[in-house]
Amino acid sequence: MIIDHSLGLVFLHVPKCAGTALRTAWQDAAEGRDVVSFFDFGFDPVLQRQVDLAHQPLMDLRHRKEWRFLRRYHVVACIRHPYQRLASACREYYRQHSRESELQMRREPPSREQMLHYLRRLPGAMDAHDLRYVHGFPISWFSHYGSKPMVDTLLRCGQLADDLNALSARLELPAALTAQLQRVGAGDGRRPSAALDQLERDPDLRALAHVLHRDDFRCFGFERSPAQFEDPELKQLIEQSLAIGPSHALPLPNLTPQMRWYYGRSSHRPEPVLRPTRSPRTPR
């Protein structure tokens, strides 16, 4: 996350959505402005767990003092198709896993075995808010507080150059920042990496994206392609987790539509209808 107090603007860093390049552009053009960048890892004493300060889900960010700036300032976030995000998140997991796997990711994409290892563990990691898997969390966790949108302007990776030009014009951004953002839109600053086309088309990856990122497809209008699980272990995990059943028989309690307790009570998971951005506000 970047907070530009001089411009009254917050950039929410949604993982694997050009955030690193946009963050760098903002910092490179920050001379003379009051710009604060949140980065690195740390232990949050309120949440009592490790967090990635660069991109925290808004449910985690809510208790921080910086939350007031999301309410006060113009908030910008960049989004990307869930298939592309999940493939990139898988690669990022191995970039951070070890020096050996980081070097591998520079040469080639994750193998199918590596991908399945990651996909099988991602649902449980989401339940636990495990920061090692933060890049695979849904977009809506970073753009919405519950069902409430907190973003004013969305940028889309598929049309980033046009969206950045429109943002600069609409907010009348400084010339130096506009120039840096144009460089990002032109593709400057992208890290070299192996192509992920095959991973993005993998049926298990797509099928899992349909489950874990279902709100992203509906909220942001991303197109879905038919996909079925082919990996037996992953298929069994998701089928059992999506079942309506006894509380202590569910492998993952946060995916079930209804958790039933033996003494007769049950808790239902709502199906929210999310708006992509918040309504225009009167400047404060």
Question: Residue locations for each model-derived region?
Answer:
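Membrane-interface amphipathic segments in extracytoplasmic regions
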Residues: 1-284
